[in-house]
Amino acid sequence: MKPPIFFLIMSTVISGTLIVMTSSHWMLTWIGFEMNMLAIIPILMKKFNPRSMEASTKYFLTQATASMLLMMGIIINLLYSGQWTVPNNPNPMASILMTTALAMKLGLAPFHFWVPEVTQGIPLSSGMILLTWQKIAPLSVLYQISPTINPNLLLPMATLSVLIGGWGGLNQTQLRKILAYSSIAHMGWMTAILLYNPTMMILNLTIYIIMTLTTFMLFMLNSTTTTLSLSQTWNKMPLITSLITMLMLSLGGLPPLSGFMPKWMIIQELTKNEMIIMPTFLAITALLNLYFYMRLTYATALTMFPSTNNMKMKWQFESTKKMTFLPPLIITSTMLLPLTPMISILD
C-alpha cells in the first residue's frame, strides 16, 4: 500500500473513532462507526491473499450486523423518547439492542467467534490496530450509556468472555490467536467493572492497549507468528525474546508486572460493591490466561523444540525498523505496579 493512501485510510479510521467518542448525537455516532469499519477493511487486506480476504469478509459481515442492530436500537429509542441524545434513558428493548451491537463490535462472548479467525488471517501490523484502536469506539459508547445498561445482560457476557478467553487460548500455537483470546478476556474484565466504576474501565483499557501494542511491535521486530518460530529467535535477538516473555507474563496478569494491577483493582472494586461470586469466578478463570502465557514462556525460554539436522536456523539482517516509542512502552508494560496507590487515589 502506498504511503499517501495508507495515510488517508488511517486518517479516516482515526476520524471515525474520534467522531464516536466526541458525539452526543446517535446518528453521528453511527456514522463514525461506519467510517471506522469501512476504512479499516483495506488495512486488513494489506497483504492481498485469500486468507486476508476471508478475514476481511468475516469482519465486515460481523460489523455490518452489529451496525444494523445498533441502528434498530437507535430508531426504537427515537420512537420512544423523541430524542437523538446519546446518554438519555433509552427504552429497555433499545438498550438491549445497543448493548448487543456494541458487544459484537468488541468481540464479547457469545459474539467472540470472529476475533480469533480475523486476527489470524491478517498481518501483525493490522492485528495490532484491530486489537487496540478498534476497541476504543465501542467502549466509549458503553461508557456513555453505562448508567442505562441492563446488568443482567452485560455481566453474564463479561464473565463468559473471561472464561472463553482463557479456555480458547489453551490449545493454541499461533501467537495472533493467543493474543485474540487474550483480548476477549480483557474485554470481559473491562465490561465487568463498567457498571460499578467506569473510570477504572478506562484505566484498564489504557494498560491493555499499551501491553498489546508493545507485544505486537516486538513480534513485528522479531518477525515471529508461531510458538515454534518464537522459540528459535534466541540466536538472533536474545534481548527482544526475553522482553517478549516478560510482556506475555504481564498480559497474563502475573504479579509484580503491570498486567496484575487492573485485575487487582477490579477485584477490589467488585468486592467493595458486595459482590463475592463474580470476582471469585473472574480470579479463577484468569488463571487460565496466566497458564497458557506461562506455558508459552516456558516453551520459549527453557525448552528446545525437536528439530532435524537439516532444519534451517532463523537468521536475519540487522533490523532497520525505527520504533522510537518502544523503550517507554516496554517500561510501562512491565513496571507500572508500584504506582498502584497513586492511581487508586486519582481514581
Swiss-Prot record:
Cite the entry's keywords alphabetically. Answer: Electron transport, Membrane, Mitochondrion, Mitochondrion inner membrane, NAD, Respiratory chain, Translocase, Transmembrane, Transmembrane helix, Transport, Ubiquinone
Which GO BP terms, alphabetically? mitochondrial electron transport, NADH to ubiquinone; mitochondrial respiratory chain complex I assembly
* The enzyme's E.C. designation: 7.1.1.2
Q: Which reaction does it catalyse?
A: a ubiquinone + NADH + 5 H(+)(in) = a ubiquinol + NAD(+) + 4 H(+)(out)
Pfam families noted in UniProt: NADH_dehy_S2_C, Proton_antipo_M
Q: Where found?
A: Mitochondrion inner membrane
Q: Which cellular components does GO assign to this protein?
A: mitochondrial inner membrane
Bilayer topology? Multi-pass membrane protein
Transmembrane regions: 3-23, 25-45, 59-79, 96-116, 122-142, 149-169, 178-198, 201-221, 237-257, 274-294, 325-345
Q: Does the keyword ATP-binding apply?
A: no
What family is reported? Answer: Belongs to the complex I subunit 2 family.
Q: Name the PANTHER family on file.
A: NADH-UBIQUINONE OXIDOREDUCTASE CHAIN 2
Function, please?
Core subunit of the mitochondrial membrane respiratory chain NADH dehydrogenase (Complex I) which catalyzes electron transfer from NADH through the respiratory chain, using ubiquinone as an electron acceptor. Essential for the catalytic activity and assembly of complex I.
Q: What is this protein called?
A: NADH-ubiquinone oxidoreductase chain 2
What is the organism lineage in this UniProt record? Eukaryota, Metazoa, Chordata, Craniata, Vertebrata
